Every structure is written in C-alpha cells, then in structure tokens.
Amino acid sequence: MTNKLRSEETITSLSSFMASTLSIASPSPCSIPLSVTKVSPLKRKRPTHLNIPDLNPQQPISTDYFRFREGDAKVSPLKRKRPAHLNIPDLNPQQPIRTDYFSFTDFAHQNGTVSFGGNGFGVVSRNGKKKFMEDTHRIVPCLVGNSKKSFFGVYDGHGGAKAAEFVAENLHKYVVEMMENCKGKEEKVEAFKAAFLRTDRDFLEKGVVSGACCVTAVIQDQEMIVSNLGDCRAVLCRAGVAEALTDDHKPGRDDEKERIESQGGYVDNHQGAWRVQGILAVSRSIGDAHLKKWVVAEPETRVLELEQDMEFLVLASDGLWDVVSNQEAVYTVLHVLAQRKTPKESEEENLVQGFVNMSPSSKLRRASLVKSPRCAKSQSYYYNSENESPSLNREIGSSPSKSPITPWKSLWAKAACKELANLAAKRGSMDDITVVIIDLNHYKG
C-alpha cells in the first residue's frame, strides 16, 4: 500500500515538472514582441557591410586586354579596313582589248540614253516612259574577223527584257553557225529561219514569260540579208527614197489573221489595236510561251545585192516607227548628213573600230588604238525636223550624184540616230526607242 502511494506521488511530481517545462519553452502568441520584422522568403537579405579593397591609386591598371592601344586608329566594326597596298597589274597600254560585238550593256548610258558610232554605223537607244528598258541591240562589226562582214540587230522586248536580252546574246551566234557553207539565196533564207527557231526554242526552255520582236541585217560579200519578227522594221534609202525591206507582223494583216484563225486562235480589236487572243499586238515573236500556238518565231527574210543607189539602212524598234514615217526617217538622216561637211575632232573620239575600252564613264573614251585620219574642223549643227523649211524636201531629195554620201560621212550616223530618236520623243513616243543606221557605202567595192 505504501509503495502504491509512492508511485502515485512520483507520477504527480513528474507531471507537474513537465507542465512547467512546456510553459517555459512554448510562450503564448501574445508574448511575441511586435517590433520583429518578417523577411520575405523571395528576397535575399542585403549584407550589412561590403568589403571593398583599398586600391592604391598609384598602381596602374593593366590594359593588355584592350583592343586598341595608344596611337592606333580606331576602326568601326561595320567597315573593313582598307589594305595598305593594292597590287594593280601593269597593263600594256598598246595592247587593245578585243570585243567581237557591241550591245546596249557594253556602253555606259546617261539619262536613259546610250549612243555610239563606228566605221560604217551609228546607234542610239533611249528609254521610254516605262520604268525599265526593254530594248536591246547587238552589233558585230567584224563578223568572223572580216571587217566587210557585219551583223546588226535591234530587239524590242515586251513583258520584260528577258527575251530581248537572250536574243541579243545568242541569235547572232546561231546565224553564223547556220550560215556556214550556205551559198544560194534559198539556203541563206533557211539558215536564218533555223537560227531564229533555235533561239526561240532555247528561250522557251527557260520557262520565262516574255517576248521580243526582232529585225536583223547581215552584210557580206556585196549582199544584204534582212530578217524580221514582229513590228521592228528595216528601211532602205535608195537614191533618197525610202523602201521598207520588212513587213510588220501585225494580227490585223490579212495573211497573219488567216494563219492564226486556222490554228484555232482569234484576233480581236482592242482599243484600236488588233491583238492575238485579245492580248498581244504582234503576230510573230521570240518567246511568248502562253501564245506560242499562234505567235510563231519564223522570220521573213530577204536577200538583196548591194547596188550603187543604196545609201544607208535604218533598223529601228516601233518606238520610232509608231510616230515617224519611213520617208520622214530617210529625209531626217539625209539632212543631218548633208549639213555636216567634215566631222569635228570631238565626234571622232566616239568612233568604234573593232576594239573598245569598257569605260564606266558617261562619255565613251577613245575606243581604238588604231590611228584613223583626222579631218579638218568645221562648224556643224543638229537639225530639228519639226521646224522643217519649205525647201528641205527639194534639198535632201536631190539626186545622189549631186550630193553623194561618201564613206567618211558615216562618222555622223550616230548624230542621225540621235536626231531620229529625239524626233520620236518630241512627237510623244511612249515606248523605248532604238535606232541603228548603217552606211552601205562602207561595204561596197
């Protein structure tokens, strides 16, 4: 009994001791001091003190890692540093740069116009109202190394310049290839046909939707071969009278309309112009894949013997022929040539005689290192055909025997080309204008 009482007292004492201990270790919430600030678990507590080393101001700081040192010129990271020395090869100034052909892109042009002249020809090409130039041309004054054998071509692009550029790059090569060993007139006509069709086929394989009208002339062995597609035209001056050597391929032409309709197509008059399928205003061209069933690439070709009364040939795009008649063109050229007795020295600088310096300047520098005879200086001027005098027709329509066009006057073929191009522009031509004039006297004899 006594032991049981002792055990109960012991348990009671232990319970009292534990209760007092818990009351000390776990104070009530009301006993927490109000001055304690809670710290967010997302923020790091700023240290109360930063140990910043005391740097000696007399101790220099190493700058080995800096990009530029004292005395170096700073270079912008956006610009490349120019090398200290350029090795430019010493070219022999007496060595001519040979070119087998001339084209629109070979010569720098200013204000949308390019012009140059050579021994027996002149060229002018100027941009119309469109944003991009679509005319091209190709001149090979010494075909197969023969100065009396030349190729001339004017190409008028539509739907872009791709077709005209392709023709200018390739047609003359195919003509030379196809004409090899050709003798009779019929063989030459077939050779030109094959060259045009091959050019068309090769361009169509590129899958480009574009087209080009063409007029070409090859002069060789006292004969002239003229071919055309579309509305580019060749006009001959024979004893002061204009003679068209080509017929424009227009959908309104009876034979062309019949051919198109026989192939299941149709010709429609849209705003005063006849058009194939109501779209294209020419019935033959290179390219125009979407109309190829009706717009063929077979040219019409003529072979003529050079005769004494043949004075010059004008090849031009429709930018000229739409506003200037054949006879007006001949009159204008004759008048320009008649007014210039001898060429000025400055004009002689623009001659091209088979060699050319590809200058980027707006003025073509002396192109040939071969000396040509200089002519005496004289006064000269350009004729404005819009202010034509009543006596002009009698003067320029006179017999060639009274005022012959001698070979040296071909120096002014370029001036005559400029006059024709300016005349067309003044009359409101909206299209690109390209004019090539060939002095046929250069190829006679």
UniProtKB/Swiss-Prot annotation:
Cofactor needs: Mg(2+); Mn(2+)
Highest taxon in the source lineage: Eukaryota
PROSITE patterns, alphabetized: PPM_1 (PS01032), PPM_2 (PS51746)
Lineage start: Eukaryota, Viridiplantae, Streptophyta, Embryophyta, Tracheophyta
Protein name per the record: Probable protein phosphatase 2C 14
Family of the protein in this entry: Belongs to the PP2C family.
Catalytic activity as recorded in UniProt: O-phospho-L-seryl-[protein] + H2O = L-seryl-[protein] + phosphate; O-phospho-L-threonyl-[protein] + H2O = L-threonyl-[protein] + phosphate
Bias (Polar residues) ranges: 390-404
Cofactor: binding details: Binds 2 magnesium or manganese ions per subunit.
